[in-house]
């Protein structure tokens, strides 16, 4: 009886770990947003090579060249506060997007036409624009960069 119970418990443990394990290493949407879009150091400083320097640490080019990416050079708290500002419709039609009430310092990285993975080459364009972000969760935080306007 003892061996039979042990086998049942072991089987249940393996089953539970099989369900839980895939989510253990998965990056959350808020963490992915921070990794892909936040550069609070504001390290671009008008460098024409900023986007090419950022492609590896921010994983802009993991398996393929990302066509466009925008970095936000503002404190995370300021970006999170946008989640309580004006609601707008997202590009995909969802209703969880919010538009910043003021402009933010951003850098747009656009893939140059002749670039192919793994040698992704980007143009760097700094500007001050309003941004639109999707927010979700509890607490309600940024999970997707939708646009700059």
Curated annotation (Swiss-Prot):
This is Ribonuclease pancreatic. Substrate binds at residues 32, 35, 66-70, 91. Residues 43-61 have a biased composition (Polar residues). PROSITE patterns: RNASE_PANCREATIC. Residues 1-25 form the signal peptide. Gene3D superfamilies: Ribonuclease A-like domain. It catalyses: an [RNA] containing cytidine + H2O = an [RNA]-3'-cytidine-3'-phosphate + a 5'-hydroxy-ribonucleotide-3'-[RNA]; an [RNA] containing uridine + H2O = an [RNA]-3'-uridine-3'-phosphate + a 5'-hydroxy-ribonucleotide-3'-[RNA]. Its main location: secreted.
């Amino acid at each position: 009886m003892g061996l039979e119970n042990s086998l049942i418990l072991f089987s249940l443990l393996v089953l539970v770990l099989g369900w839980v394990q895939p989510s253990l290493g998965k990056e959350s949407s808020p963490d992915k947003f921070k990794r892909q879009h936040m550069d609070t150091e504001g390290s671009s400083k008008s460098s024409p090579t900023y986007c090419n320097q950022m492609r590896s640490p921010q994983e802009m080019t993991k398996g393929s060249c990302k066509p466009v990416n925008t970095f936000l050079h503002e404190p995370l708290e300021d970006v999170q506060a946008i989640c309580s500002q004006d609601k707008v419709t997202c590009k995909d039609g969802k209703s969880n997007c919010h538009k910043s009430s003021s402009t933010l310092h951003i850098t747009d990285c656009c893939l140059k036409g002749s670039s192919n993975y793994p040698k992704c080459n980007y143009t760097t364009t700094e500007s001050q624009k309003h941004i639109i972000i999707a927010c979700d969760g509890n607490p309600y935080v940024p999970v997707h960069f939708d646009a700059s306007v």
